[in-house]
Amino acid sequence: MAKLALINREEKRRKLVAQYAKKRAALEAIITNVSLSDEERYEARLKMQALPRNSSPSRLRNRCQLTGRPRGVFRKFGLCRHKIRELAFNGEVPGVVKASW
């Protein structure tokens, strides 16, 4: 199980990303709009740089919802491979069956 501090840090980042999503999207639209003047685009770039670092979605890490494990996480389930196997064998993950061919 991951340290609780790491799990809490990731949750804090998710909240910041959600909080600044609209502002970040608006600034990104200004920055990529080539019809605007260079000064306007530069000002938007400065405002983007002034946003909190953790408000960027690229800093998020997918973690297992049960254990907090950062690696081997399946997006479809939000669980790490260990927990998927464990829960699937117990029949607790709907739609997952052992492969047979």
UniProtKB/Swiss-Prot annotation:
Keywords carried by this UniProt record: Ribonucleoprotein, Ribosomal protein, RNA-binding, rRNA-binding
MF terms (GO), sorted A to Z: rRNA binding; structural constituent of ribosome
Disulfide bond positions: none
Spans traversing the lipid bilayer: none
Signal peptide: none
Family the entry assigns: Belongs to the universal ribosomal protein uS14 family.
NCBIfam families: PRK08881.1
Subunit field text: Part of the 30S ribosomal subunit. Contacts proteins S3 and S10.
Record's function text: Binds 16S rRNA, required for the assembly of 30S particles and may also be responsible for determining the conformation of the 16S rRNA at the A site.
Name assigned to this protein: Small ribosomal subunit protein uS14
